[in-house]
Amino acid sequence: MEQNHGLLIVLSGPSGAGKGTLCQELLRQLPQVKYSVSATTRQPRPGEMDGLHYYFRSREEFQTMIEQDQLLEWAEFCGNYYGTPQFAVEQAIQAGNDVILEIEIQGALQVKQRFPQGVFIFVVPPSMDELSQRIHKRGTESEEVIQKRLQTAARELEYVSEYDYVVVNDEIPLAVDKLKSILLAEKCRVKRKPYVFQGV
């Protein structure tokens, strides 16, 4: 019997759609799912810890990671670099663990080229007005940066057709239930079951 590898789950969507909140709640409810910590050159937000939420790196350190092909994907977003360290993700999937990546859309498209068997989920807010309110509520960015994020979000919505699923994050419990249903359905797909049934 073949080894049953884990799922690679890619969660992305516009800034402020609530990807981080949904990811944290999904991990709380499904401890068998592992979170892939991304590397970034952006400054930590209040409460974020290096190695737990992100690997916070200088631009020079990040450039070295790119040159040494240590990243599964990387992208520049709003003036900062983001990327996914490759080794830990591949090791976890081969060991049978499900791994979730919470990454930007540019990065998700790179991952899709390398891992088309992944599960690609696009998280959207219920409206652009709601998205604007969420980003303003953070209180961590200037108005100029917020407007840039909103303009980027409008462009990013054009990529929804590149994903397998779309989840509207209106109410967190409902959105998390949708994510759990997607993962359950993917686990049951025939193409992911290496078994041959005999005598049925």
Curated annotation (Swiss-Prot):
Residues bound to ATP: G13, P14, S15, G16, A17, G18, K19, G20
Give the matching InterPro entries: GK/Ca_channel_bsu (IPR008145), Guanylate_kin-like_dom (IPR008144), Guanylate_kinase (IPR017665), Guanylate_kinase_CS (IPR020590), P-loop_NTPase (IPR027417)
The record's listing under HAMAP family reads: Guanylate_kinase (MF_00328)
* SUPFAM superfamilies tied to this protein: P-loop containing nucleoside triphosphate hydrolases (SSF52540)
Extract the Pfam families matched here. Guanylate_kin
Q: What does the record give under GO molecular function?
A: ATP binding; guanylate kinase activity
The role this protein plays is: Essential for recycling GMP and indirectly, cGMP.
Gene that produces this protein = gmk
Q: What is its EC number?
A: 2.7.4.8
Top-rank taxon: Bacteria
Subcellular location as annotated: Cytoplasm
The protein, known as = Guanylate kinase
Catalysis performed (reactions)? GMP + ATP = GDP + ADP
Q: Which NCBIfam families match?
A: guanyl_kin (TIGR03263)
* Protein species of origin: Desulfitobacterium hafniense (strain Y51)
Q: Which residues form the Guanylate kinase-like domain?
A: 6-184
SMART domains attached here?
A: GuKc
Q: Which UniProt keywords apply?
A: ATP-binding, Cytoplasm, Kinase, Nucleotide-binding, Transferase
Q: Quote the cellular component terms of the Gene Ontology held in the record.
A: cytosol
Family to which this protein belongs: Belongs to the guanylate kinase family.
- Enumerate the PANTHER family for this protein: GUANYLATE KINASE, GUANYLATE KINASE-RELATED
